[in-house]
Amino acid sequence: MRQQFLGALIGAAFGTVFVLVNSGDPLPSAIGWVLRALAVVALAAVVVLGVRAGGRPTLEGRPMFGPSYRVIVIGEVVLLVAGFFVLSLLDAPVQANVAWIATVVGLHFVALASAWKARSILVVGVVLTVLGVVGLALLGSAAAWVPFVSGVLSGVTLLGGSLYGVRRA
């Protein structure tokens, strides 16, 4: 399996989870189910396009999942755990968790864009980070919408970025 396809598949899988988990209230039920179905279709499209692309090399032979990737993922885990701890100390609403996850995952992609010298994922990273920060800002006034803003829209961003990446491969 090509490394770039594996990366797109991981992004699409997490994007699908973001949409599946966060497409509930305050969205109308029918819209939530449509969003969930579209996310699954997008994930399937990433799989089909990735398999059809075959074994073409990517990233000019550089390893995607080398030492820099591992350092970034370890940093991501530390930030997630520390952030959840701080949010619990602050008695933040449960919706804060998805906003924090989106923020940290966005920063993860920004760091990966630099490590991999792949500007295409920088856009995904910046958008996810912004959606996470907006979700955190909404906690004081519209917490019910945080799962949509930081969850569903982040999932759509990951799925779109994965489709873009696998089409370019």
Region annotations inferred by a language model:
Residues 81-126:
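Membrane-proximal helix-loop-helix units in multi-pass membrane proteins
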Residues 1-22:
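The first (N-terminal) embedded transmembrane alpha-helix
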Residues 17-74:
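Selected alpha-helical membrane-embedding segments in polytopic membrane proteins
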Residues 32-44, 87-103, 150-153:
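Structural signature of hydrophobic alpha-helical transmembrane segments
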Residues 121-169:
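Terminal transmembrane helical module of multi-pass membrane proteins
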Residues 10-14, 73-85, 127-129:
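Core segments of transmembrane alpha-helices
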Residues 20-33, 85-96, 138-146:
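Helix-coil boundary and interhelical linker segments in multi-pass alpha-helical membrane proteins
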Residues 48-63, 107-116, 160-169:
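C-terminal ends of transmembrane helices
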